[in-house]
Amino acid sequence: MAEGNVGKLVQIIGPVIDIRFSRENLPNLLNAIEIEGPDGKIVVEVSQHIGDDTVRCVAMKSTDGLVRGMEAKDTGGPITVPVGRATLGRIFNVIGEPVDEKGAVAAEAKAPIHRPAPSFEDQATSTEILETGIKVVDLIAPYLKGGKIGLFGGAGVGKTVLIMELINNIAKEHGGLSVFSGVGERTREGNDLYNEMIESGVIDKTALVYGQMNEPPGARMRVGLTGLTMAEHFRDEEGQDVLLFIDNIFRFTQAGSEVSALLGRMPSAVGYQPTLATEMGALQERITSTRKGSITSVQAVYVPADDLTDPAPATTFAHLDATTVLSRQIVELGIYPAVDPLDSNSRVLDPAIVGDEHYSVARGVQEVLQRYKELQDIIAILGMDELSDEDKLTVSRARKIQRFLSQPFSVAEQFTGMAGKYVPLKETIRGFKEILEGKHDDIPESAFLFVGSIDEAVEKAKGK
């Protein structure tokens, strides 16, 4: 099929466009087609072949101003985006155009956003932990280098703040390259993140790709792939260990559902697209470690109506190595990050990988918190006085642990007025071990709230 192949628009229904080509020059599926609109170039992607000479396409930009009869030019291949060092410090849209008003990008190479996942022989696995400096994460559900991590939570429980803190900590402590894909989230948050990165000096090691809430569904469905393509280049061509942040993977599913309905497909469970698992698999299987380098991905997962059994979060679960679940009950206690230590888990929390001390402290913490959870009904009905001395001690330690799992974040400094803390894993394990052993039974529980290491809690108690 020759490049420079021109067709004509025959139907426009919102973001879905039908274009007629000659029979012998019908563009392939997933090809990018360019249309010169009144406000510049509009890129659409082929989704279906209808009859012998018409393709149905999904637009990556608003189709305002397009009319039937306009010319459309087939590019002869998928959407291609700039890759390489030139992308660092810049903001792109889904089709790889810079949107930060800093001029053109002098990228040496471009790569298509659709490509197969690495073959079985090319993949490599490691069992190294990625230290985040966030106590609750490092202790209870540690992250695997080159693994996939999901941050699950309903609306307003702190997923984006946690992602911003991870970007900040990992860029400062590990100096790695990051790619951030903003998929269908708030433009204001994207702007805040960009300014935050400039202030903290990590912008030069990050490429940002945004397809926010106001974009058409085609853009929101493909922007995750655009960010992933940039990350793959750093992994495959430069042998880097890259971090890929996706906020929010649910919006990718949501956009897919919108596109599916617009293309006239029969909906599946809860109104989602019938191809939900396939689309999710095509994206997730490309996020992996190869012999050349690794991609560690952290994905925020919005949970509709706090229901973890909804098909969108449930499909995402299957692909993850670690899940960090944010809980509204913990938000109500005023403890941040609101990570649920009993619901969050990780494949890496295994004595063979993290060592016996880390494993036993983590399980000890969960045991105490679980016992406290069981005792809460008794406390609510009968009060603390009816508990045995042993249970009273358990409750006291559990409340200290609960508060010690909180931590001030660097990225939230302007809201809280508290300096952010990065806590090394050794310090985290030591702190919780001392609480479990009863070394700090005499310290009031308020001293453990929003501190870094255990020494700070002791100092805070002395200061009172």
UniProtKB/Swiss-Prot annotation:
Lineage: Bacteria, Bacillati, Bacillota, Clostridia, Peptostreptococcales
PROSITE patterns in UniProt: ATPASE_ALPHA_BETA (PS00152)
Record field: catalytic activity: ATP + H2O + 4 H(+)(in) = ADP + phosphate + 5 H(+)(out)
UniProt-annotated location(s): Cell membrane
Designated name of the protein: ATP synthase subunit beta
Keywords (A to Z) from UniProt: ATP synthesis, ATP-binding, Cell membrane, CF(1), Hydrogen ion transport, Ion transport, Membrane, Nucleotide-binding, Translocase, Transport
Species assigned in the record: Alkaliphilus oremlandii (strain OhILAs)
Family designation: Belongs to the ATPase alpha/beta chains family.
CDD domains assigned to the protein according to its UniProt record, in alphabetical order: ATP-synt_F1_beta_C (cd18110), ATP-synt_F1_beta_N (cd18115), F1-ATPase_beta_CD (cd01133)
